[in-house]
């Protein structure tokens, strides 16, 4: 979306959901996480790499699950094709604040709550519950 201000078209490799939605970019962000982990995170470099890689990879997958746009350039720079998942339950978000504050925007927010945020919160809750002691849920003999 920022590219629009610089005259980069939506469908361009550097346009919306282009190179920044590729596995190559996810790997690059993993490497960035590896590099900055000792400076900003209490975790190891491996944790920094994993967080960077998974954050971008999950974003690619979620954008491929939307019902609009041109798809994601998941295999850029090797393949310029834009891809969608076969199953696309997430409503595509309108551009701009005015669009987000409309009836359609509310529908999008409810769709994202259902398909993105609720599952994320469930995973976080499970990690917090089981994280410190994975055996907690198993009764002792």
Model-derived features with residue positions:
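N-terminal membrane-targeting hydrophobic helices
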Residues: 1-141
């Amino acid at each position: 979306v920022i590219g629009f201000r610089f005259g980069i078209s939506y469908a361009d490799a550097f346009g919306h959901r282009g190179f920044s939605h590729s596995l190559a970019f996810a790997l690059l962000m993993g490497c960035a996480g590896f590099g900055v982990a000792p400076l900003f995170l209490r975790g190891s470099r491996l944790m920094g790499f994993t967080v960077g890689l998974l954050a971008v990879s999950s974003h690619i997958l979620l954008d491929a699950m939307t019902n609009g746009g041109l798809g994601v350039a998941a295999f850029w720079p090797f393949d310029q094709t834009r891809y969608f998942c076969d199953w696309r339950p997430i409503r595509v978000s309108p551009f701009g604040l005015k669009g987000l504050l409309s009836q359609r925007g509310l529908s999008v927010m409810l769709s994202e709550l259902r398909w993105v945020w609720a599952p994320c919160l469930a995973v976080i809750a499970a990690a917090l519950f089981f994280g410190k002691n994975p055996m907690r849920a198993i009764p002792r003999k």
